[in-house]
Amino acid sequence: MKYIMFQGTSSNAGKTLTVAALCNLLSRKGYRVTPFKSQNMSLNSYTTVDNDEMSIAQVMQSEAAGIEPNCNMNPILLKPKEDFTSQVIVQGKPAGNMRFDDYQNNFRTQAIKAIEESLEYLKEDYDITVIEGAGSPAEINMYDKDLANMLIARMTDADVILVADIDQGGVFASIVGTYFLIPEEDRKRIKAVIINKFRGNADVLKPGIEKIEELTNIPVIGIIPYDETLNLPEEDSASLSTHHFSENEKITIGTLRLPRISNFTDIDPLDYEEDIGIKLVSIYDDLEDLDALIIPGTRNTVNDLVELKKSGAFDKIKKISKEIPIFGICGGYQMLSNNIIDESCSESKYGSVEGLGLLDMTTEFGQIEKVVQQSEGTIIKDSSLGFEKDTKVTGYELHEGITILGDVEPLIKIKKGQGNDESGLYDGAINGNVCGTYFHGIFHNFEFRRKFTDQLRINKGLKPLGLTKDDFKESKRVNYDQLGDLFANNVDMSFFKDLLRD
């Protein structure tokens, strides 16, 4: 097994896409290659075919490599909650909620064991592992607590390439600072530097690059330009703020940017629909001039409901529900309830709270363990939102709580999964303009999505498109190959050929 590792001078330097790019290129050349990130902190997660939970970033990287996602590609997933606490997912399964200091001081041994096991597991099926670090390897205040950078490089004897983000400014200082803050023993592992997200004429960088190479004796092997045409899933809400959605189209679908928004990749397929613009709306924004509103997932339904009330969005949503479709996904679906019952305060200190009351149902927490699984079913009946009876849908569930329906119709008859409650019979609910589901990825179903957007087109006096081709599905592979080509055309690929020969 050969290990190649990308570490960054900072968070959001481009490590995730750099790993995806190299995985894509190596896969296209016939190598058996897998991505790996020992520890990831993210609110965007995914359920695998084995019903394991992992970061969406490693899912994206595995798709770029053309392989099935596996939780061993991301053995430790930290999902931030409140007050310096995260839910810790180990090899796809919840290990509990832990405070940061408790995790670092008391869980480290178990975490390292899981990382070693996952690396060993991947050896069976792959020849090359492309590893992504986390944040910066030069966090000297907690260097001895590292679980994602040089510890993993030592564990795998990996060659390290440092990725630096020039778009943030100060790229040369960040390269030199990172390099010299790393202890000499680990510094020797750094074999090259890539400058990422460059805009303009690369010739202006030559004097700086020459000085960097003189100071570090490390070659700069590539300058990757900033490419705004790439359309790939975002890993976290920080990246979401810079994501370029299509706006100013004939139809505007608002997506409510909840304070604790999660799994916002659910909306990605809508961005590929002709005539459709996606507008991220704050809870403080005016919600007028929208043609539909999506309330996405959240890592804390109760706390975000409280924020909706404080901001005034609570009443705004109730008002516009009489005029436009409102679609809730997972936590957003739970918010549509009359009440959310949380007697044990498992979600927050507020306990039970009033919901938006747009669907006659009640959501209860503390009744079941977290649901993590892939799901499928069929739409139960035709609706004014465009959905048609017997349309097949798939998705994945990542939720706590059950939802008990009152005088309201379920949306989906379940073939596989849990849905609203332990019976596993039905998921979601629909009444007039308002609809919701526990299925993440619901809009990744082309027929379901197209029926919904065609109804929006009809509502606006536009011609429906019908079931033509799925631009989202086709564009994913195109985008992954475009990412790989961008890397290959701007990086010295002979460097990697030499690494693989060693």
Swiss-Prot record:
Single GO BP term: cobalamin biosynthetic process
GO molecular function: ABC-type vitamin B12 transporter activity; catalytic activity
Name of the featured protein: Probable cobyric acid synthase
Entries under HAMAP family matching the protein: CobQ
Active-site annotation: C330, H440
Recorded name of the encoding gene: cobQ
PROSITE patterns, A to Z: GATASE_COBBQ
Keyword Lyase tagged: no
Keyword tags: Cobalamin biosynthesis, Glutamine amidotransferase
Function according to Swiss-Prot or TrEMBL: Catalyzes amidations at positions B, D, E, and G on adenosylcobyrinic A,C-diamide. NH(2) groups are provided by glutamine, and one molecule of ATP is hydrogenolyzed for each amidation.
Organism: Methanosphaera stadtmanae (strain ATCC 43021 / DSM 3091 / JCM 11832 / MCB-3)
Pathway connected to this protein: Cofactor biosynthesis; adenosylcobalamin biosynthesis
InterPro entries, sorted: Class_I_gatase-like (IPR029062), CobQ/CobB/MinD/ParA_Nub-bd_dom (IPR002586), CobQ_GATase1 (IPR033949), CobQ_N (IPR047045), CobQ_synth (IPR004459), GATase_3 (IPR011698), P-loop_NTPase (IPR027417)
GATase cobBQ-type domain sequence ranges: 250-448
Stated family: Belongs to the CobB/CobQ family. CobQ subfamily.
Keyword Zinc: no
CDD domains linked to this entry: CobQ_N, GATase1_CobQ
